């Protein structure tokens, strides 16, 4: 009696939500939580949330209070991050400091 083994939680590889840095091309799209932000929006099922509201909502629950679906926790940036080449910093030197 009571000698059952608990199942290990399945680690599902959830899809990444799209991060939209500027939603002006989508028409009048705003965060459905604060209704203020239209930049830095994240897709949450059938609506958008700004990063500030998403962070706040994730600190309280993993479910969206608007659509009741799981909140997105992984983001897919709309543009690949870039950085200058490692050798570029050596060839460009700032001018000497003079007070």
Curated annotation (Swiss-Prot):
It holds the Pfam family zf-P11. It is a lipid-anchor. The keyword Acyltransferase does not apply. Keywords: Host cell membrane, Host cytoplasm, Host membrane, Host-virus interaction, Lipoprotein, Membrane, Metal-binding, Myristate, Viral budding, Viral budding via the host ESCRT complexes, Viral release from host cell, Virion, Zinc, Zinc-finger. Residues 77-89 have a biased composition (Low complexity). Gene3D superfamilies: 3.30.160.310. Myristoylation is required for the role of RING finger protein Z in assembly and budding. One of its GO terms (cellular component) is membrane. Residues 74-99 are annotated as: Disordered. It is found in: Virion; Host cytoplasm, Host perinuclear region; Host cell membrane. Changing residue 97 to A: 90% decrease of virus budding. A zinc finger (RING-type) spans 31-67. The keyword Lipoprotein applies. One of its GO terms (biological process) is viral budding via host ESCRT complex. Its main location: virion. Interacts with protein NP; this interaction probably directs the encapsidated genome to budding sites. Interacts (via RING domain) with polymerase L; this interaction inhibits viral transcription and replication, Z partially blocks the product exit tunnel for the releasing nascent RNA product. Interacts with the glycoprotein complex; this interaction plays a role in virion budding. Interacts with host eIF4E; this interaction results in eIF4E reduced affinity for its substrate, the 5'-m7 G cap structure. Inhibition of host myristoylation by the compound DDD85646 leads to proteasomal degradation of protein Z (and not lysosomal), strong inhibition of Z-mediated assembly and budding, and reduced levels of viral replication and transcription. This is RING finger protein Z. It comes from Lassa virus (strain Mouse/Sierra Leone/Josiah/1976) (LASV).
